[in-house]
């Protein structure tokens, strides 16, 4: 009998989601995440552009995950960008309440919830440092993770280091930045400091994989390097 594949469900916003071909090379990190795993792992990307914790639940997206997630699967949960907006949530009340619902949904099915703090936006100060634009949401998530004993990957901190390593100019390559007529999908040009290019999406996906390893989650044994060799 074939062993059941491990499913890794992703709940999040546009920085995680699969982007349509007409937006290429825009990509969420979830779009390329499956490339980092061996064959026994299936990534199920339920992330959606514009999603906040509350809209994701209200649109039935968490319910759709609940119907398919099973014992031993994983649910990675990254929200914050849209929870900041007026139609979103408050960090230490409704945001945490909805995150708790995500964690409980996974655990009720015998699956493992993992919180992931939001990716930073590409906003540099005059000293070449990334400015924090996510308010209290990442800290609220980390506080709740401690309370619920849910592992957390601090992608906020990891992306800050990544962007600063590239610097203000080179980091544009991680995002959807084009001059007019440089790319057929963006004839008028675009300067997007939130959404990733395919290169950026893969860099960020690798940071999530790094977080899985650092936490010592059993899922780490199924990670492969980009060259296709098992991680040592």
Curated annotation (Swiss-Prot):
Active site: 14 (nucleophile), 191, 195
CDD domains for this protein: Rhamnogalacturan_acetylesterase_like
Keywords: Hydrolase
pH dependence, record text: Optimum pH is 8.5. The enzyme is more active in the 7.5-9.0 range, achieving a sharp decrease in the activity below pH 7.0.
Protein EC: 3.1.1.-
Family according to the record: Belongs to the 'GDSL' lipolytic enzyme family.
Pfam families per record: Lipase_GDSL_2
Control of this protein's activity: Almost completely inhibited by diethylpyrocarbonate at 5 mM and completely inhibited by phenylmethylsulfonyl fluoride (PMSF) at 50 mM. Dimethyl phosphite achieves only a 53% inhibition. Also inhibited by metal ions (magnesium, manganese and calcium) and chelating agent (EDTA) at the same level.
InterPro entries: RhgT-like, SGNH_hydro, SGNH_hydro_sf
Signal peptide: none
Induction: Up-regulated by growth on type I rhamnogalacturonan.
UniProt subunit comment: Monomer.
Name recorded for this polypeptide: Rhamnogalacturonan acetylesterase RhgT
Function of the molecule: May play a role in the degradation of type I rhamnogalacturonan derived from plant cell walls. This enzyme has a broad substrate specificity, and shows strong preference for glucose pentaacetate, beta-naphthylacetate, and p-nitrophenyl acetate (pNPA). Also active toward acetylated xylan.
Temperature dependence: Optimum temperature is 35 degrees Celsius. The enzyme is quite thermostable in the range of 35 to 40 degrees Celsius, and suffering a decrease in thermostability above 45 degrees Celsius.
Tree of life domain: Bacteria
Molecular function in Gene Ontology: hydrolase activity
């Amino acid at each position: 009998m074939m062993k059941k594949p491990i499913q890794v469900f992703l709940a999040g916003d546009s920085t995680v989601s699969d982007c349509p071909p007409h937006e290429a090379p825009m990509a969420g990190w979830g779009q390329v995440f499956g490339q980092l795993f061996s064959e026994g792992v299936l990534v199920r990307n339920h992330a959606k552009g514009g999603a906040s914790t509350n809209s994701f639940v209200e649109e039935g997206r968490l319910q759709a995950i609940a119907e398919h997630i099973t014992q031993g699967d994983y649910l990675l949960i990254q929200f914050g960008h849209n929870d900041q907006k007026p139609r979103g949530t408050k960090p230490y009340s409704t945001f945490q309440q909805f995150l708790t619902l995500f964690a409980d949904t996974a655990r009720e099915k015998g699956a493992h919830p993992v919180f992931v703090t939001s990716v930073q936006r590409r906003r540099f100060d005059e000293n070449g440092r990334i400015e924090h634009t996510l308010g209290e949401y990442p800290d609220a998530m980390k506080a709740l993770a401690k309370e619920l004993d849910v592992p957390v990957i601090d992608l906020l901190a990891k992306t800050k280091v990544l962007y600063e390593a590239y610097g203000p100019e080179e980091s544009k390559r991680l995002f959807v930045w084009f001059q007019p007529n440089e790319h057929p999908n963006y004839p008028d040009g675009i300067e997007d400091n939130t959404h990733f290019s395919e290169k950026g999406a893969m860099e960020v996906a690798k940071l999530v994989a790094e977080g899985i390893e650092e936490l010592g989650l059993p899922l780490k044994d199924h990670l492969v390097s980009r060259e296709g060799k098992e991680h040592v």
